[in-house]
């Protein structure tokens, strides 16, 4: 490797908004990285995930055009 072109790779402390800290290595010179969420407080990892069904595009599409598969299946069974 060429000398003088690579950044320094230093031990870095990552500090989460929830108070969790852990050590890693980074090229950031301050030695500290502040983050908003981590694996200890993120809802996906903690299991406290909320599923929000706001009835977006799919619901508007079905309201506008109806469920075509349901109508087609009913016609086929009536013909048989």
Curated annotation (Swiss-Prot):
Which InterPro entries does the entry mention?
Ribosomal_bL28/bL31-like_sf, Ribosomal_bL31, Ribosomal_bL31_A, Ribosomal_bL31_sf
Q: Could you name the domain of life of the organism this protein comes from?
A: Bacteria
Query: What biological-process terms (Gene Ontology) are attached?
Result: translation
Cofactors demanded by this protein = Zn(2+)
PANTHER family this protein is in? 50S RIBOSOMAL PROTEIN L31, CHLOROPLASTIC, LARGE RIBOSOMAL SUBUNIT PROTEIN BL31C
Q: What is this protein called?
A: Large ribosomal subunit protein bL31
The record describes the protein's role as: Binds the 23S rRNA.
Q: Which Pfam families match?
A: Ribosomal_L31
- Report the cofactor remark: Binds 1 zinc ion per subunit.
Which cellular components does GO assign to this protein? ribonucleoprotein complex; ribosome
Q: Which family does it belong to?
A: Belongs to the bacterial ribosomal protein bL31 family. Type A subfamily.
Q: Which NCBIfam families match?
A: L31, PRK00019.1, PRK00528.1
Q: Which UniProt keywords apply?
A: Metal-binding, Ribonucleoprotein, Ribosomal protein, RNA-binding, rRNA-binding, Zinc
- Which molecular function GO terms apply here? metal ion binding; rRNA binding; structural constituent of ribosome
The UniProt record gives the binding positions of Zn(2+) as 16, 18, 38, 41
Subunit organization? Part of the 50S ribosomal subunit.
């Amino acid at each position: 490797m060429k000398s003088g072109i690579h950044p320094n790779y230093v031990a870095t402390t990552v500090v989460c908004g929830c108070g969790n800290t852990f050590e890693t290595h980074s090229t950031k010179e301050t030695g500290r990285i502040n983050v908003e969420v981590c694996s200890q407080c993120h809802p996906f990892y903690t299991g406290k995930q909320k599923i929000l069904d706001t009835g977006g595009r799919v619901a508007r599409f079905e309201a506008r055009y109806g469920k075509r598969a349901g109508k087609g299946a009913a016609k086929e069974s009536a013909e048989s």
